[in-house]
Amino acid sequence: MKQRTLSIIKPDALKKKVVGKIIDRFESNGLEVIAMKRLHLSVKDAENFYAIHRERPFFKDLIEFMVSGPVVVMVLEGKDAVAKNRDLMGATDPKLAQKGTIRADFAESIDANAVHGSDSLENARNEIAFFFAARDL
């Protein structure tokens, strides 16, 4: 089934200048970039986007990291896009990610792990709406 999912290329990946390589992974695996923008998240936007984690011990560090530099936010579309993107990203902790996944190849730590991807179709819809108006899609 054709789906849409949200992907964020995080500040660590932008600093390493691997955005093009990450996008190529998506495109060469059947995911089309249908909307994309580069931006610098405000603390308020980062806190609102990651509100589900507000009570978790890593929340403060996550927000500090996500506002530490620009990010690239994309809507990816393709067959089973949510699951495919999750597979391409690999485990949250790059030390546990399978070789050949984005996080295994480009991430340094569980915090600086290169990419974010929606974890369900429902969250994908909400996350896409957070960053993109319907007219942008």
Swiss-Prot record:
It comes from Helicobacter pylori (strain Shi470). Homotetramer. One of its GO terms (cellular component) is cytoplasm. It is an enzyme of class 2 (transferase). Major role in the synthesis of nucleoside triphosphates other than ATP. The ATP gamma phosphate is transferred to the NDP beta phosphate via a ping-pong mechanism, using a phosphorylated active-site intermediate. SUPFAM superfamilies: Nucleoside diphosphate kinase, NDK. Its EC number is 2.7.4.6. Keywords: ATP-binding, Cytoplasm, Kinase, Magnesium, Metal-binding, Nucleotide metabolism, Nucleotide-binding, Phosphoprotein, Transferase. It comes from the Bacteria. It catalyses: a 2'-deoxyribonucleoside 5'-diphosphate + ATP = a 2'-deoxyribonucleoside 5'-triphosphate + ADP; a ribonucleoside 5'-diphosphate + ATP = a ribonucleoside 5'-triphosphate + ADP. Gene3D superfamilies: Nucleoside diphosphate kinase-like domain. Belongs to the NDK family. This is Nucleoside diphosphate kinase. InterPro entries: NDK-like_dom, NDK-like_dom_sf, Nucleoside_diP_kinase, Nucleoside_diP_kinase_AS. The gene is ndk. Its main location: cytoplasm. The active site is at residue 116. GO terms for biological process: CTP biosynthetic process; GTP biosynthetic process; UTP biosynthetic process. It is found in: Cytoplasm. The keyword Magnesium applies. NCBIfam families: PRK00668.1. SMART domains: NDK. ATP binds at residues 10, 58, 86, 92, 103, 113. The keyword Kinase applies. One of its GO terms (molecular function) is metal ion binding. Its cofactor is Mg(2+).
